[in-house]
Structures are given as structure tokens and as C-alpha cells.
Swiss-Prot record:
It comes from Vibrio cholerae serotype O1 (strain ATCC 39541 / Classical Ogawa 395 / O395). It is found in: Cytoplasm. GO terms for molecular function: iron ion binding; N(6)-L-threonylcarbamoyladenine synthase activity. The gene is tsaD. This is tRNA N6-adenosine threonylcarbamoyltransferase. Binds 1 Fe(2+) ion per subunit. Its EC number is 2.3.1.234. Its cofactor is Fe(2+).
Amino acid sequence: MRIIGIETSCDETGIAIYDDEKGLLSHKLYSQVKLHADYGGVVPELASRDHVKKTIPLIKAAMAEANVTPQDLDGVAFTAGPGLVGALLVGATIGRSLAYAWDVPAVPVHHMEGHLLAPMLEENPPPFPFVALLVSGGHTMLVEVKNIGEYRILGESIDDAAGEAFDKTAKLMGLDYPGGPLLAKLAEKGTPGRFKFPRPMTDRPGLDMSFSGLKTFTANTIAANGDDEQTRADIAYAFQEAVCDTLVIKCKRALEETGLKRVVIAGGVSANKQLRADLEKLAKKIGGEVYYPRTEFCTDNGAMIAYAGMQRLKNGDVCELGLQARPRWPIDQLTSIQK
């Protein structure tokens, strides 16, 4: 079976074609970073308009690279949510239209399920069950994963997502958009131990998280110490260390609560080198394993949507004609899009 995946939930247009026997046949991605850079963040209307321009050409390019025709496809998967409603509607409209024209099922995919399953595209995929740490610009959550579609949310951020905190803190420090990766790079030049940031909500039981207070702490630290280059690097180091420590502490608790030994980390922040290293240390300490996707599949992409869509298609999770998008869609309520 073959399926095409369409990702348009935010500011990346991603298209991929996946074969359940041969694996990934093609993968195309267009990033809108330059489009939004002058605004310091994603402008939803601009994002939607750009998806309209880029999606069809990328679909043609992906099909040409994979050497497939519409007759070779068994389904069209698209991100149905969560995300920016206008951006989602572009992908949903195109996806459902193509499914109708090609007489194949339309398969709505949950964006975070796509991230969660992205490591399955690797040569050494994680076996079920495992604990997933999903860390992106819009979501940060810990999920117990028993199998595909069997998810239990263990904890999540009650305010800013980790990726959002990285980007907002980077903006406070005068870094360009998107600031998260730039802050991480600046942190590599930082001096360990000069500044000590709090580890929010780690002094109490539970698996929920909070990162918004770290922005205020960063602003106060800058105000008290200046913003010369080395000080900025030291602050970046302390901020990143606080976020990573918090995530690792919560991961450890989640593993203890579930009795599991395997951790999957996915989403844009899963590309962070420090977070990966810290989770590797945790896994080694407890005799566990940590899995994550290759860097290009950490951020939004069509490959993860195509893979997740294939699993949904095999399970019969397809939708009738009619347009639906879910800007807000809990990952433990996946069946609601078909109803």
C-alpha cells in the first residue's frame, strides 16, 4: 500500500509518499521561516496563503521523485489538527479534494501523533510500549504509548510549551526568529554554573510542567547583569539547562509511574543536543533506552504524516467527505475527527 501525506499545520509545507513495504519513497519540505522572520513569529494569514501557493507544486514534485501516479496511491493523509485553523484548512481542502478525485480514502491525522510516530521511520524503531516526551513550539506533554492509537496523557505544560519558551526567551535576548535553535547554539559558549535558574514544578508531585516563569527570570537576570556577549551566552546556558533538567526530571517520574524503560522524544525541541544527551544519561542510569527521529524529522514534515496516515488507513480510520479541521484536538481523543 502507498499513501501521500500532507502537512500544513503551521509554517512548514511538507509532502511525502510512504510505502508500507519499501518505506519512505519521497519527502519534500518548504519552510516559511524567511516569510515570517520580519514579524518575529508566525503570521497565520501569511502562513495560510503560502500553503496555498506551495502545496500543489510540492505534491507534484514528491510524486515525480517517487515515480508514482494517482493510480498508485491507496490514500491521502493530511494533518487535521491541532494547529492554525487557516493553515489546516488548506491541507484538509487539498487532501480531501485529491482523495475524491483519485477515488481513494481521505485520512485525517493528528499532528502530534505524527511527531510521536516519527521515530518509527528510523532503522531501529522503538518497540511498544514506551513513554513519549512530545516537545514542540505548541505542545509539551508526556504520553504513555501502549500501541498505535492507545495513548494516555500523563502530564503537560500548563502554560508555554518548551519550544515556545525557547523562542520567546531568545526574542528577549535579541536573537532572530526562530530563536530556539539560535539560543541553543549561543548556550554552547556559556559558562556552566554562573547562573542558576529554577526548575519549575519539580519541587512537587505530578507530571505537569510550566515554562512561562523562566522568561521572566531571564528578563530579570539580563536586567541585573547586563547583556554583553559572554553574559548572554551564560544566561542562554542556564536557561537551556533549566528546561532540559525539568523535562528529564519529569521523564524519570513518568517512567517510574508507568514501570517502563523506553523513552521516545519527538517534536521540534527533540533536535536539541543538550536534551538528547541528558535523556541518554537518564536511560543509561536506569538501564533503559531512548529513541528519537533524525533531525530533519524533528520539525514538522510530511513524512511523519504519511507514516501515521498509513497506520490509520490500515485500521480503517478514514473520513467521509466534508471539511473538518481541529485547531484544538487532544491526542487521547483521536477518534473524534471521524465522528
